[in-house]
Amino acid sequence: MKRLIPVVSALALIAGTASAENIKVGVSPGEHAEIMEEVAKIAEPMGLNIDVVEFSDYVVPNQALADGDIEANSFQHEPYLDNQVNDRGFALVPVATTITTPMGVYSDSITDMEAFPEGGSMGIPNDPTNGGRALLVLQSLGLITLAEGTGLVPTVLDIVENPKDIRFRELDAAQLPRSLADLDAALINTNYAIASGLNPKEDSIAMESADNPYVNIIVVREGDEEQPWVQPLIDAYHSPEIKAFIDEKYHGTVLTSW
């Protein structure tokens, strides 16, 4: 009988690991990474082991998902995904909404938008959807006027009024916090602001309205929507514990969608 014990133990171990799902979820730095680490804790007792994979930019997570290097990602809003699908042909689909993170205006040299100097430099993200989002924020603040009919993806070429003669510098979104010393102001996505040590509520000089179309999403490969790990991932993310974590940690600068 003693000889059977290791065999039985091994079989038990195999059965245990077979019943658990193991997935990799791609995230960007800041709140997306921080929240997903908490989601992983909630998901583990549900039989889902999440390996959180952090990417430093907005381009690689979708490529990694399309290539099969990860099973899901959680870092982008739907307008960005739509642009990526159209431009790069990714077969990726959203399966759940997560959070909304209003974009903020930050500056090392001024404390309100009225003080923005004539001919000053303004940093905006260089990807179409977040760059367009930044321009829409500036229009809502009265600094520029955009041509009608540009939707959610206007470019600097669509600016029809620029009374302060703002000089736009289009930079990688992750680089904008590090470039503040060289700019009069910049529009920065909340995840990169938080990752760089900025507090959106205290350090921004203006914020995008919370009523915006840029709710973030969990994305999987087309055809994986019914995989057995998808619903536990969503349930863990949409749990009361995660909602409480977000409310307590971000104090209103990150908003839940559920």
What are these regions (language model features)?
Residues 95-144, 243:
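A conserved helix-loop-strand patch within extracytoplasmic ligand-binding domains
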Residues 53-63, 150-178:
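Short helix-initiation/N-cap motifs at beta->coil->alpha
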Residues 30, 54-58, 68, 73-82, ...:
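Beta->alpha turn/N-cap motifs
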Residues 97-106, 130-139, 194-258:
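Periplasmic-binding protein-like
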Residues 83-95, 108-110, 182, 187, ...:
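Ligand-binding "clamshell"
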Residues 58-89, 104-106, 111, 131, ...:
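Pocket-flanking alpha-helical
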